[in-house]
Amino acid sequence: LMAFGAMDAFVAAGAGQPGRTVWFSSVNTSLQALQSLRSGQLAALAGGHFIAGAWALVMLYDYHHGRDFASEGLELERPMFTLFTPAMARRYQQRFGQGFDRLDVRPYSKVLNPTVQRYQFGFAQLL
């Protein structure tokens, strides 16, 4: 986690305090990163790119059950990152703090939800 190494070096050099005299950002959804955003040590935090695997599995599930995703094109562009606010970080920790066993992607499946016409994948809506 480069941002935390940079923060440590900045503090060790006596150059100031993260979140007060200098701003750091990170791309990470570790507990440390989420807490650092909530405490103000990180000025910006992005994450959520790992959820692309879940979206791919939804599409493969649908394909396996006879619903081809080619109608949306073979190259899908979906937002991979979400810019977290402190409130989003808190919700993320509450919902997924102990793991992703509570993540339910069934509402995104076209097979399980025949009224779904286009995939509406996005990390922010999971919060």
Locate the predicted segments by residue.
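Hinge/cleft segment of the Venus flytrap/periplasmic-binding protein
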Residues: 56-127
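Short beta-strand elements at the ligand-binding edges of bilobed clamshell
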Residues: 39-49
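Charged/polar, solvent-exposed surface patches and flexible loops
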Residues: 8, 35, 39, 62, ...
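Short, hydrophobic secondary-structure boundary micro-motifs
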Residues: 19, 45-46, 71-73
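Sec/Tat-exported extracytoplasmic proteins
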Residues: 6-14, 41, 64-68
